[in-house]
């Protein structure tokens, strides 16, 4: 009996908590395959997952990764040195969230040596004039590592380092949102037609959104630049706002 309007906010919160839209979408595919969710309900959840996944990029923008190790330590302490079940569960959450942000920090740091490679810098500088190539790069990289949060974290690092301008970064961001749909597609391969429709709808949402944003790339870039100047956003937060705007509009 879950309505579309109920499904959307529930899934936004759920995705924000587990930090994985792909994980939520795979669960949805399984529930639809088992007949526990209708296609309409599933679409509402997928839409919510797309919005909920933007929370990670905002957390990176707030530099929460700087506190990853203390959070991991606190989570481990609650998990291994307390006998209270609620504290154990809280410890699992803190340990997992801290681990995610520690890993994202490591990936961001791994990009640092590339900033001194002239060929790499020159190639990235051309992407502002080749948005379709940016989409392909974003989609391909996200399909490869199965995490849009990770690729967007890398993108935030590249943009903050001045290796990409905003018009070059945005198509990669759009591609990341297409690439993240591969997990649902793979999960639906052995499922029934209803589950395949959910995966197809997920792909369709993000592809249509990307095509529209590419057509409107100049005004979309101007909008994000306006957010940046009016709100005084850091480069990382600028990408986070772009990610949020894309998924909410989508």
Located regions from the model:
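Short, small-residue-biased leader/transition segments that mark boundaries at the very start
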Residues: 1-8
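Mid-bilayer segments of alpha-helical transmembrane spans in multi-pass integral membrane proteins
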Residues: 50, 54, 63-67, 98-106, ...
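Juxtamembrane membrane-interface segments at transmembrane alpha-helix termini
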Residues: 41, 81-88, 102-109, 167-168, ...
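Alpha-helical transmembrane segments of multi-pass membrane proteins, especially transporters
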Residues: 11-15, 26, 40-49, 93-101, ...
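Membrane-interfacial helix-loop connectors
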Residues: 17-18, 24-52, 58-67, 75-79, ...
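Transmembrane alpha-helical segments and their short flanking loops
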Residues: 104, 115-127, 189-250
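Interfacial helix-loop-helix linkers and transmembrane-helix boundary segments
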Residues: 39, 84-91, 191-201
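Hydrophobic, small-residue-rich alpha-helical packing segments that form membrane-like cores
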Residues: 63-75, 79-148, 153-157
């Amino acid at each position: 009996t879950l309505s579309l309007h109920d499904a959307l906010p529930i899934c936004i919160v759920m995705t924000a908590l587990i930090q994985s839209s792909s994980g939520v979408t795979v669960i949805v595919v399984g529930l639809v395959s088992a007949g526990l969710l209708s296609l309409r309900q599933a679409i509402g959840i997928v839409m919510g997952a797309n919005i909920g996944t933007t929370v990670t990029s905002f957390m990176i923008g707030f530099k929460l990764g700087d506190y990853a190790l203390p959070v991991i330590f606190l989570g481990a302490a609650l998990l291994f040195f307390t006998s209270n079940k609620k504290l154990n569960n809280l410890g699992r959450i803190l340990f997992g969230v801290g681990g995610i942000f520690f890993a994202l920090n490591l990936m961001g740091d791994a990009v640092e040596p590339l900033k001194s490679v002239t060929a790499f810098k020159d190639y990235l500088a051309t992407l502002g004039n080749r948005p379709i190539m940016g989409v392909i790069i974003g989609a391909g990289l996200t399909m490869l590592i199965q995490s849009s949060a990770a690729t967007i974290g890398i993108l935030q690092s590249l943009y903050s380092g001045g290796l990409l301008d905003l018009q070059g970064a945005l198509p990669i961001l759009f591609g990341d949102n297409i690439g993240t749909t591969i997990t649902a597609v793979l999960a639906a391969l052995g499922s029934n037609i209803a589950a395949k429709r959910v995966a197809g709808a997920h792909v369709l949402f993000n592809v249509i959104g990307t095509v529209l944003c590419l057509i409107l790339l100049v005004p979309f870039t101007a909008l994000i630049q306006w957010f940046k100047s009016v709100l005084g956003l850091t480069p990382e937060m600028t990408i986070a706002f772009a990610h949020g705007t894309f998924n909410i509009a989508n």
